[in-house]
Swiss-Prot record:
One of its GO terms (cellular component) is mitochondrial matrix. This is Mitochondrial intermediate peptidase. Keywords: Hydrolase, Metal-binding, Metalloprotease, Mitochondrion, Protease, Transit peptide, Zinc. The active site is at E558. It is an enzyme of class 3 (hydrolase). Signal peptide: none annotated. It is found in: Mitochondrion matrix. Binds 1 zinc ion. One of its GO terms (molecular function) is metalloendopeptidase activity. It comes from Coprinellus disseminatus.
């Protein structure tokens, strides 16, 4: 419960779980798409928009750094050296312990009972505010001492969170609050939702079990973490090479690589040893006319040792045991309780509907691959398409924009994003000066998020260029959540003799975060997020960073998360911004990718244009996209099967389950001697929720087509999204939000029929990239 995504030590690319005290085919088919022919007017680029271009394209020449003022990380004056972070963690721990004691004493006063939900949220925020900062520092700071200090702070406070997760006293106090109708009546809908989230998370921690069973829960949880760590290490362990005869590489499409490999074989007079995942392996899979080398590489790439399989099956078994310990039939039942899906049966309904929709398209694509294979081998009848044929007969195409575009620099894309947000929400991005010591690297740029009515509503720190010792991939870090702070009643907090300076240190850290917004009651802690990517650095010789289209998609995706954090300003941090259900959190970010399908939106990348003449354009469909989508649906089904009650069956065999699913519901036959499941890392981070990305893709596709496609820059539609979805964070039932946004009251119940309906919605996005979070 109190164990935040900040405590997601094991798999940072997994979907962030919303913990409460948490961290914190024949020739390629061409389709013609009609693009209306009317002129659409849009707002001109502002001076601030244009400054974004210089900020990111000429960072050395920008004036984003202040040469006079100095401070500490994120503007906290004391965080100027690594030891200060350790000191802050210790001060936070003292103050958190005192706040915990205040909550435990709440039964002595009805007035204190009324404040319990607020104080639980304060406690969560107090800890997460440091844990989340430490998580960012240990993933992004270039200096070893800072990373070590961040690890120490992170582990110290996570250890205390783990105590709170199973704290019987806190649970009993919350139970008193929720059992008293007169107190419940005083809670706002948002406060009540926050209380229910705390309650459910306590119950998932076996809080109401006898001591011996609670101890077993702790032991099982520890085993799961340990096995999860081993599983992820195994998933990332390189697979052994396979032996390829040089004679099997004759006729390679990539002639340069083919010649080099054959020369290597002649020189060594040995078969080639090709490592799965290497450039050579990828080239062979895409360009070797002979089937045998592709088959061998496929099998090698999907191989496992018995020990690797054993670790996964032990993890699945321990999860099932933990679920049954607290009265749930399976880990899937336990996990899905507070998700949009609610039950494994509803997930099955969704996946079945999605399979039924996608299967005809996938089979049509597979038939085309079979025709290509037949022609290639001059066969009298259509052959079976095997898994190792996919890339050879249908090489994956990189994502491409729907219309021809000039090279897009990083600054140009940020300018386009700012212009898009101003059209949709009346919000823009503005370069801001950062004081000396405020950022952890010279590359980091600070942006103010500015609302036309309320002024600054949050900050984004953009750390976008690759460097050594920086976390890989793209990620959105919520370093500070939104919440209301003027009703904290700090005066009622307990004190401890001799600890006054530590209490003041923690209070000073929190005071920096607070702001009073125009036209809004109260004082708020404003959100602060960090975007991490690893784009190429601009230079004098190469010029500004030019993004590939997939990188533009990535940036739009992550900025979807960032704007959810900015606009999801709630009174309780536990439900702010992206603090929402796992199977809902990707909706805003995937929807952002859809905007890149619109030439009207793409015209915002031109600073001097205020109109777009939209004419008929051609869109080249990837004929194998449906095969890939179907494969992802199958993986979601595997995830559900692995987390069903069958995981406790003594005869459970993860490889047999995988083979059975492939042979009964897959497109291509299962390949003997393969066991891909040991490399399916999301089985840990996404356990029982891998369907979520598909689910949000389906909803985002329908939201785009029904709400935005006709007029993507329309302010009223943007305000509709903001008012019905983004501003609520996780404070409202996601089904209610989707139902209101789509004007489909039949979805509001979120029942099996609603899940089935979403499964029927065609996933029209050709922009999604699996695994981006």
């Amino acid at each position: 419960m109190l164990g935040r995504a900040a405590c997601k030590v094991l798999h940072r690319h997994a979907l962030k779980n919303p913990y409460r005290f948490r961290g914190c085919l024949v020739a390629q088919k061409e389709t013609t798409r009609q693009l209306a022919t009317h002129v659409q007017h849009h707002l001109p680029a502002s001076a601030d928009d244009r400054l974004l271009v210089d900020l990111f394209d000429q960072p050395g020449a920008s004036t984003s750094k202040s040469s006079f003022a100095s401070t500490g990380l994120f503007g906290h004056p004391t965080l100027t050296h690594p030891g200060a972070l350790i000191s802050l963690a210790e001060a936070t721990l003292v103050r958190a312990q005192l706040l915990t004691e205040r909550i435990l004493r709440a039964r002595e006063s009805r007035d204190e009972l009324v404040k319990v939900v607020k104080n639980l949220d304060r406690l969560s925020d107090m800890l997460c505010g440091v844990i989340d900062l430490a998580e960012l520092v240990r993933n992004a700071h270039p200096e070893r001492l800072w990373m070590e200090a961040a690890n120490h702070a992170y582990e110290t406070l996570c250890e205390f969170m783990n105590v709170l997760n199973t704290h019987v006293g806190l649970y009993e106090v919350l139970k008193v609050v929720l059992s008293d109708p007169s107190i419940v009546k005083t809670l706002s809908p948002e406060a009540y939702q926050t209380a229910l989230i705390f309650w459910r998370d306590f119950e998932k921690s076996a809080i109401d079990l006898p001591p011996a069973e609670r101890q077993k829960f702790v032991s099982l949880s520890s085993d799961i973490l340990s096995l999860g760590r081993q599983f992820l290490e195994n998933a990332n362990t390189p697979r052994p090479p396979t032996s390829i005869k040089a004679s099997h590489l004759a006729g390679l499409k990539d002639q340069g690589m083919g010649v080099r490999l054959q020369l290597q074989a002649r020189f060594t007079k040995k078969d080639l040893q090709v490592y799965p995942g290497s450039l050579q392996a990828q080239m062979i899979m895409r360009s070797a006319p002979e089937e045998e080398p592709r088959r061998r590489i496929y099998i090698a790439s999907n191989s496992s040792t018995p020990e690797q399989i054993s670790v996964l099956e032990a993890l699945l078994r321990k999860r099932a045991e933990l679920a049954q310990l607290i009265g749930r039939p399976s880990f899937a039942h336990l996990t899905l309780d507070d998700k949009m899906a609610k039950t494994p049966e509803n997930v099955s309904n969704f996946l079945d509907a999605l399979m039924d929709h996608t299967r005809p398209f996938a089979r049509r694509a597979l038939h085309t691959l079979a025709q290509r294979k037949q022609a290639h081998h001059n066969l009298p009848s259509l052959p079976v398409v095997q898994a190792w044929d996919r890339d050879f007969y249908c090489p994956p195409d990189p994502p491409a924009p729907p219309i021809p575009l000039p090279p897009l620099t990083l600054g140009t894309v940020f300018m386009g994003l700012s212009r898009l947000f101003r059209h949709l929400y009346g919000v823009s991005l503005r370069p801001a000066k950062s004081a000396s010591g405020e950022t952890w690297h010279a590359d980091v740029q600070k942006l103010e998020v500015v609302d036309e009515n309320q002024g600054i509503i949050g900050w984004i720190y953009a750390d976008l260029f690759a460097r050594r010792n920086k976390a890989s991939g793209a990620a959105h870090y919520t370093v500070r959540c939104s919440r209301r702070a003027d009703d904290d009643d700090e005066a009622g907090d307990l004190t401890l003799e001799g600890e006054g300076h530590r209490i003041q240190e923690s209070q000073a850290f929190e005071s920096v975060k607070r702001h009073r917004l125009p036209n809004q009651d109260g004082v708020y802690q404003l959100p602060l997020v960090v975007l991490l990517t690893e784009f190429a650095r601009p230079s004098i010789s190469r010029g500004p960073t030019v993004l590939e289209w997939y990188e533009v998609l990535t940036l739009f995706h992550e900025m979807g998360h960032a704007m959810h954090s900015m606009l999801g300003r709630t009174e309780y941090q536990n439900v702010s911004g992206t603090r929402c259900a796992t199977d809902f959190v990707e909706l805003p970010s995937i929807l952002m990718e859809h905007f890149l399908n619109s030439p009207t939106v793409l015209s915002l990348f031109d600073a001097d244009s205020t109109t777009t003449l939209r004419a008929t354009g051609n869109n080249h469909a990837d004929p194998c996209h449906s095969i890939d989508t179907y494969s992802q649906i199958l993986l979601a089904a595997v995830d559900q099967r692995y987390h069903s009650p069958s995981a406790l069956d003594p005869s459970f065999d993860s490889t047999a389950e995988l083979a059975n699913l492939h042979n009964t519901r897959g497109l291509m036959p299962y390949v003997p001697e393969t066991s891909f499941q040991t490399q399916f890392g999301h089985l840990f981070g996404y356990g029982a929720t891998y369907y979520s990305y598909l689910f949000d893709r389906a909803i985002a596709s329908r939201v785009w087509s029904k709400v935005f496609a006709e007029n993507p820059l329309d302010r009223s539609r943007g305000e509709r999204l903001r008012g019905e979805v983004l501003m609520h964070g996780g404070a409202r039932d996601p089904w209610h939000m989707v139902s209101a946004l789509m004007k489909m009251p039949e979805l509001e119940s979120g029942d099996a029929e609603a899940m089935r309906e979403v499964g029927k919605w065609r996933i029209e996005d050709e922009v999604g990239i699996s695994g981006r979070h």
